[in-house]
Structures are given as structure tokens and as C-alpha cells.
Amino acid sequence: MSIEDLSPGTKAAVLAEALPYIKRFHGKTIVVKYGGNAMTDEHLKSCFARDVVLLELVGFNIVVVHGGGPQIESLLARVGKKGEFIQGMRVTDAETMEVVEMVLGGQVNKDIVNLINQHGGKAVGLTGKDGNFIRAKKLMLEDKDNPGDLIDVGQVGEIVSIDPTLIDHLDKGAFIPVIAPIGVGKDGETYNINADVVAGKIAEVLKAEKLVLLTNTPGVLDKNGDLITGITPKQIDEMVDDGTLSGGMLPKIGSALDAARNGVKGVHIIDGRVEHALLLEILTDHGVGTMIKSH
């Protein structure tokens, strides 16, 4: 059932429930990492765009950071390359970096901007190379099997600094920044940065009220596959150690935890496969995922 199918009475109740949250978060910044099925399913894409526009219209400052894994994989396959991941990070040689920048900074970013604008928003597409607002350096991963050794994953970046000036100007003009996770090095080199990490760091720098990460799962799941609605750093460490959390969830969890520890008041990992998941998480009493607690 969609919102359009609800009875007038139920719709009124939903709006009444949302009012305190609209008052509470008016003028606040919410950073949204957009990825997963919500980016590939046409109906979910429309729901997401409408959610973003509505939240902006009622007075929230929305900043969107997006991924684009499936689209990158599709183009890599067309040029005869296969994606490789280590500890949730995409191994990025020079040719892969060209594909990543083409897909994220071109195709995906502009598609999202266009979709939001079609639904009445004023979205502006950016990469971290615009105004050099995301400065990065080469990331080397620790080899978990051989402590002390490092793994070279190519042109994968680690954030050095984020200049919020450009985003602040867009927010003040009621524009919605849509950011592709590409950074620039001190000598102009291009870096592919994990989108969850970029979203988390932007949330920290902007002193955002909330960071919301959309995923293809209900949230953080325990060993039995059951949803954990709230999780602490200690629990996260235990789940990483025993392998419950692994792969692509590692940078997501790490980013969420860092944001929670560095002043972002609400950090949520939610199910992007749910219609209007963003509205449900922000404007209702019961969210649709996992909240990361700072302690």
C-alpha cells in the first residue's frame, strides 16, 4: 500500500504525527547517503525525490551524497573489466577511475539532479573537484591477515578536508546539493572515495542534525538476520570481530559511528527498499532501520 491509498483519516493522522518533527528540525541540516535499490527501482527513485523535495519545502536543509555501484559495474563490464573489492573498498586502477568519474560525476549525478528538479526541487550536482571542496589523499588499507602490512587499492581516496563554503551557499539559496564522492589530491589527482565515508564526513563538517544512510537491508542485522533497532560502539566492535559485520557494511558502519562520535545527533541506517523510507525515518515516531548510538 502506498501513501496515496490511505484513507483521509489515516493521512490526517500521519500529518499530525509529522508536525512535531517538522518544528523540531526546521532549519536543520540532514545529510542523506542515497544508494542501493532506491537508486535503481523507478518507483523508489520517484519516492526518494518527492521525499527530498518535501523535506526541503518544510524547511530542512537536505544534502544528498550518492553512490552508483551497479551503474559502475555495468559500464566496467561493457569495457571488459570486473570490479574487485577489498574490505568494502573498490580497487581503482587508472582505467577504473575514468569509469567511476564518468558514471558518478556524469550519468548518475545528473540523473538524480534531474529527478529532484522534475518533482519541484532545485538540485545542483557537484563532485568534490568542484571548488576543490573535498581534498583527499591515497588510502592504504591495513592487511588484516598480516598485521603491519598495507594493501594498495589504487586511486581510492582518504578524506583530508572538506570545505563547506560551497554547500553553505547552496543551502542558503534553497538549492539541494547532490554530491558525487570524488575527491582531489594536492597535485590534482582524482580519487574515488566511498560514498558512505563522504556522507559521514560532510555531516560532521556541516554539524548536521541527522545522517541517514539508505541501504538494501532493513538496517544492521544480527547473526540470525534480525533487525537491531539501536546499536552501540561496543556492540559494533564485537560484530566486526566475529564477522557478523563485513564487506560493504564495514565502511557504512565506520562512517556512521564516526559521525555519531563527532557531533551528529542522529545517525540512521535504513531500508531504502521501503517506499518513502526517508520521510518515515525523519517524520514519524517509529523509524525503519537502525540508529547508531554514540555510547
UniProtKB/Swiss-Prot annotation:
Pfam families cross-referenced by the UniProt entry: AA_kinase
Which residues carry the site feature described as Transition state stabilizer? Answer: 33, 252
Subcellular location(s) of the protein: Cytoplasm
Which InterPro entries does UniProt cross-reference here? AceGlu_kinase-like_sf, AcgluKinase_fam, ArgB, Asp/Glu/Uridylate_kinase, Glu/AcGlu_kinase, NAGK-C
Binding residues for substrate, per the UniProt record?
A: 68-69, 90, 192
- GO terms of molecular function: acetylglutamate kinase activity; ATP binding
- Name the CDD domains on file: AAK_NAGK-C
Q: Does the keyword Transferase apply?
A: yes
Q: Which GO terms describe its cellular component?
A: cytoplasm
Q: What pathway or pathways are given for this protein in its record?
A: Amino-acid biosynthesis; L-arginine biosynthesis; N(2)-acetyl-L-ornithine from L-glutamate: step 2/4
The reaction(s) catalysed by this protein are: N-acetyl-L-glutamate + ATP = N-acetyl-L-glutamyl 5-phosphate + ADP
User: What are the protein's UniProt keywords?
Assistant: Amino-acid biosynthesis, Arginine biosynthesis, ATP-binding, Cytoplasm, Kinase, Nucleotide-binding, Transferase
A GO biological-process term: arginine biosynthetic process via ornithine
EC number of the protein? 2.7.2.8
Per the entry, what this protein does is:
Catalyzes the ATP-dependent phosphorylation of N-acetyl-L-glutamate.
Under the heading HAMAP family, the entry gives:
ArgB
> Which family does the record assign?
Belongs to the acetylglutamate kinase family. ArgB subfamily.
Name the chain's protein: Acetylglutamate kinase
Q: What is the organism of origin for this protein? A: Dechloromonas aromatica (strain RCB)
Organism lineage reads as: Bacteria, Pseudomonadati, Pseudomonadota, Betaproteobacteria, Rhodocyclales
Gene this chain is encoded by: argB
